[in-house]
């Protein structure tokens, strides 16, 4: 079975990272790991203390610091370079994947052995969303209140030396040979 690094980026989202890790930890399979990278220049003391406690409690948790410096590609490449998994599932601390997706992630990878990059749909919701926001930003909002769905993300990819991130802002992934898109359904978000 393939192993996965759940690679999480965090800065000051203590409540959100706690919720995400409480969700992910019991779902890890053998040889999976959780890798958390924090922004050295923006992390709060509370988040850092929490991460250090987690690292001491779980042998499959790694915590690394790295300066973001407004360079998201470099930040994600450092995350990739610290991962041990064959595949990387990259997620921000304030995101929470669907339980169905995480429960079936290994099977989805095994069913697509030749694929380097998986586009994963994402559900965006905005608290306090107004018509003014929608018009100003040109957003599309569906009947469920999801913004710009399916908002495909390059969230799952094979860890190779060729695959890497480029572009300081609005970073994109390059170096892959094959890709697929998960179904545009809520359970795959």
Positions of PLM-derived features:
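Short, acidic/glycine-rich phosphate-metal binding loop used to engage nucleotide
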Residues: 64-72
